Amino acid sequence: MKINQYIDHTLLKPESRQDQIDKLIREAKTYNFASVCINPTWVSYAAKALEGTDIKVCTVIGFPLGATTSAVKAFETKDAISHGADEVDMVINIGQAKSGHFAFVEEDIRAVVEASGDKLVKVIIETCLLTDKEKIKACQAAVAAGADFVKTSTGFSTAGARLDDVRLMRQTVGPDVGVKAAGGTRSLEDAQAFIEAGATRIGTSAGVTIMEGKQTNSGY
């Protein structure tokens, strides 16, 4: 199991400085992580810095609340891709999901999928705010809309990934759609447990710590 290729090396704090983005990129190159996951303002910078490598540039859409309109999410997606994004992690409309409006949720996801062209779309359902029934319906909406992945969490709400949620999401989407566990991966053991539960990608700011076999108290 090559853990490094599961990791989206993540820095999404609003106060992130350029020197911190530089460090993230250096670490991603050192460990050959799957991607760096950064806010849209840093996409073009990271894309230039990662030219000639296999490391993807991942960014976030409708983040972290998911409450912008579908048109805005689609525009954000096109803009991010035009600046060099390879993957987009979008947040569903959580309020509409809580209202039981899953046709709306599906169309919102589809707007981003259609705007993404051939780029990878991961759908953040924010598991900590949903019931199990809502998690299942949100995952089904993501699959129906043509998304490539479902993802547990933004890292900006009340909790991150849980093993039970990853298992439920994997069971719901089947073998052909990815599952990303984000938030709460603080050690190599955590990462291995999420992978065994069905995760095919790990979103974490603790990638280096994980690779060194240590543990951190970092929140994301």
UniProtKB/Swiss-Prot annotation:
SMART domains, per the entry: DeoC
Pathway assignment: Carbohydrate degradation; 2-deoxy-D-ribose 1-phosphate degradation; D-glyceraldehyde 3-phosphate and acetaldehyde from 2-deoxy-alpha-D-ribose 1-phosphate: step 2/2
Name of this protein: Deoxyribose-phosphate aldolase
Gene Ontology CC terms: cytoplasm
Compartmental location: Cytoplasm
A GO MF term: deoxyribose-phosphate aldolase activity
Main subcellular location of this protein, as a coarse class: cytoplasm
Catalytic residues of the enzyme: D89, K151, K180
PANTHER family in alphabetical order: DEOXYRIBOSE-PHOSPHATE ALDOLASE (PTHR10889:SF1)
Stated family: Belongs to the DeoC/FbaB aldolase family. DeoC type 1 subfamily.
Pfam family, one: DeoC
Alphabetized UniProt keyword annotations: Cytoplasm, Lyase, Schiff base
Reported function: Catalyzes a reversible aldol reaction between acetaldehyde and D-glyceraldehyde 3-phosphate to generate 2-deoxy-D-ribose 5-phosphate.
EC id: 4.1.2.4
Domain of life assignment: Bacteria
NCBIfam families, per database record: deoC
Record GO biological process: 2-deoxyribose 1-phosphate catabolic process; carbohydrate catabolic process; deoxyribonucleotide catabolic process
Record has Acetylation as a keyword: no
Enzymatic reactions: 2-deoxy-D-ribose 5-phosphate = D-glyceraldehyde 3-phosphate + acetaldehyde
Organism: Streptococcus mutans serotype c (strain ATCC 700610 / UA159)
CDD domains according to UniProt: DeoC (cd00959)
Keyword Cytoplasm (UniProt): yes
